[in-house]
């Protein structure tokens, strides 16, 4: 499994010095075979070094393990902000993000940096979607996703085996995406274009 090297992070902080580092950017949600970073330990390192820490939680709202990791990071160390995508998590069109964090003043200051010029569409789309789903509807969607992920993995495994490929085992550190080997494919970019033409993303 591929993830951030914590020893390298510590060494780089010592090499550069905290005054030369704006922040550390970690991630909970990424494409397999990369796994979720150990955001709890990174938060502890950032707290000890007094360096800002931003978590890319792009897909994380739909995965309870990612949410738990972010909550723990906020509790045990330093997290200045975490950012989530509305389209990836909340079934709305592309273009919106939720910036949150444990320090309300800091998040308010972020919001004040771009007053009045952003489009209202992402906020309105999100508001309408959440109102129509309601709390119970949202929880039901999360349960459906949790039930469907193992089914998708098993179905992909069967298709992969049929064509002499395999699904990479990344579920211990990545519940967001699934990777299939493409060894033997002469031009992987051509495979990407085939998938794109068939609306597979």
Locate the predicted segments by residue.
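Conserved PLP-enzyme active-site core in the AAT-like
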Residues: 1-158
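Conserved C-terminal alpha-helix-loop-beta "cap" of PLP-dependent enzymes
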Residues: 79, 151-201
